[in-house]
């Protein structure tokens, strides 16, 4: 069964933004046409499930679904930890997401290569003007 899912607690660059296509491709490589497990509690205003998507690691196709796709996006610098929604995460997930983003920034990977990457929420707001 196919469902539309928004990854909880991260925000990725929009299509028209730097790293938007790369972020989308990385996520697609992780989850497209794969069996995933989704831990969720709500839907967004567009009817999408908002949740944590767990998938098998590409390095171990016979392993259980133990790779958090949102955390994977953060670790390669292709998303922001969406602190606005941090309270909806478990304390453990908050800690992992914060750490992944901090480490990606320190390594200057993905969008953190740019001197001042524009968060997608600011990009969307600018598009409305």
Where are the language model's segments positioned?
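Small beta-barrel nucleic-acid-binding modules, primarily SNase/OB-fold domains
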Residues: 1-129
């Amino acid at each position: 069964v196919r469902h539309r899912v928004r990854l909880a607690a991260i925000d990725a660059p929009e299509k028209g933004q730097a790293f938007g296509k790369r972020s989308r491709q990385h996520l697609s490589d992780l989850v497209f046409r794969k069996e995933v497990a989704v831990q969720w509690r709500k839907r967004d205003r567009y009817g999408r499930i908002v949740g944590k998507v767990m998938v098998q690691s590409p390095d171990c196709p016979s392993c259980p679904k133990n790779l958090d796709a949102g955390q994977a996006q953060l670790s390669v610098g292709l998303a922001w930890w969406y602190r606005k929604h941090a309270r909806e995460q478990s304390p453990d997930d908050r800690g992992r997401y914060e750490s992944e983003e901090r480490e990606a920034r320190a390594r200057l990977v993905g969008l953190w290569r740019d001197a001042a990457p524009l968060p997608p929420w600011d990009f969307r707001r600018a598009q409305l003007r």
